[in-house]
Amino acid sequence: MAIEFVATNINTADKKEIYRMTKGDSLKIEGLEKGLSVPVEKYALYIEEKERSKQDGTTETYKQNVLTFTSGKQKFGTISATFIRSFMEIVEIMEDDPFAIIITGGQSRNGRNYVNCELDCDF
């Protein structure tokens, strides 16, 4: 299955880099401490095709956006639409300049926890 990249700063001709960014384990953004500053080195926003079982016993295929990024030797990942939207706004502003993000989040009006990010302007 081909990977459909939406946005990335990796060399998409490098198969090892593609594997590193799209396969294997990554730390979940949701588990990071709020207020933590994370320097971003490489990132990849891509579309992943998944299957899920339905109640009638059949399966259906769906697509979801996945964001992964690296900081040092660690890879982080999320499917949070809120986080992805904020992260991509930062990427657009920063273009090719180095940057770090600060992990933020809170609780929505309906009581669900969410994770987000903002640009670390002190980086």
Where are the language model's segments positioned?
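Short nucleic-acid-contacting surface segments enriched for D/E, G, S/T with interspersed K/R
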Residues: 31-33, 85-104
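Flexible glycine-rich surface loops and low-complexity tracts that mediate binding to linear polymers
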Residues: 42, 94-117
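OB-fold ssDNA-binding interfaces and closely related basic DNA-contact patches used
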Residues: 1-69, 110, 116-123
